[in-house]
């Protein structure tokens, strides 16, 4: 017998469609979907890593490759992982600097989720002998003081892990 949790899925459009092709029109927050967080009272970290990220240099058109890692403490919403994957695919033919990409991913996730905290790490492969790593993060404005302290302590603890992304 199959059992079911209280997860809300009725508004998800991408998951289960079999759609795997790169979206038209480039990256956009409209490609992302979210579902309700069943545990908004508890600060916990969600980490999503996309190790096959590719985009194009806006000057040369040469490919840039790397890993994009998103870490966040959800408030009311969580990002749906397949929509996140398709969002990442949308960068494949998009020309932009690595610094802009990392900050745009942060802003798009903040617009969609309004998380308590979010950090995006762009760990780009060396090109021309230079390795670029970009880190962008933001805390939610206006959290009650007690919640803010708990969130910041959770972030501090998460960041002190030796390698929180290793299985």
From Swiss-Prot:
* Segments forming a coiled coil: none
Q: Does the record bear Membrane in its keywords?
A: no
Q: Could you say which residues bind substrate here?
A: 79-81, 98-99
* SUPFAM superfamilies, sorted: Tetrahydrobiopterin biosynthesis enzymes-like
- What GO CC terms are in its UniProt record? cytoplasm
* Catalytic activity line of the entry: 7-aminomethyl-7-carbaguanine + 2 NADP(+) = 7-cyano-7-deazaguanine + 2 NADPH + 3 H(+)
One Pfam family cited in the UniProt record for this chain = QueF
Pathway-wise, it operates in: tRNA modification; tRNA-queuosine biosynthesis
* Enzyme class, spelled out: oxidoreductase
Its predominant location is: cytoplasm
A GO MF label: preQ1 synthase activity
What subcellular locations does the record give?
Cytoplasm
Instruction: Give the E.C. number(s).
Output: 1.7.1.13
Q: What top-level branch of life does the organism fall under?
A: Bacteria
Which residue spans traverse the membrane? none
Work out whether the entry's keyword set contains NADP.
Answer: yes
Q: Which residues form the active site?
A: 57, 64
A Gene Ontology biological process in which this protein takes part is: queuosine biosynthetic process
UniProt keyword annotations, A-Z: Cytoplasm, NADP, Oxidoreductase, Queuosine biosynthesis
Which family does the record claim for this protein?
Answer: Belongs to the GTP cyclohydrolase I family. QueF type 1 subfamily.
- Function, as annotated: Catalyzes the NADPH-dependent reduction of 7-cyano-7-deazaguanine (preQ0) to 7-aminomethyl-7-deazaguanine (preQ1).
The protein depicted here goes by the name: NADPH-dependent 7-cyano-7-deazaguanine reductase
What lineage is on file? Answer: Bacteria, Pseudomonadati, Thermodesulfobacteriota, Desulfovibrionia, Desulfovibrionales
């Amino acid at each position: 017998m199959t059992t079911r949790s209280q997860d809300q899925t009725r508004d998800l459009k991408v998951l289960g469609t079999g759609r795997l092709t790169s979206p038209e029109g480039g990256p956009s927050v409209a490609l992302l979907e979210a579902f309700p967080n069943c545990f908004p009272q508890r600060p916990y970290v969600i980490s999503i890593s996309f190790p096959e990220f590719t985009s194009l240099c806006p000057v040369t058109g040469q490919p840039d490759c790397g890993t994009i890692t998103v870490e966040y403490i959800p408030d009311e919403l969580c990002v749906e992982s397949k929509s996140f994957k398709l969002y990442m695919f949308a960068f494949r033919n998009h020309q932009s600097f690595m610094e802009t990409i990392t900050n745009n991913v942060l802003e798009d996730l903040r617009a969609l989720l309004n998380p308590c905290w979010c950090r995006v790490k762009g760990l780009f492969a060396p090109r021309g002998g230079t390795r670029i790593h970009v880190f962008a993060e933001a805390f939610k404005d206006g959290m009650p003081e007690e919640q803010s302290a708990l969130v910041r302590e959770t972030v501090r603890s998460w960041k002190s892990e030796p390698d929180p992304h290793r299985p």
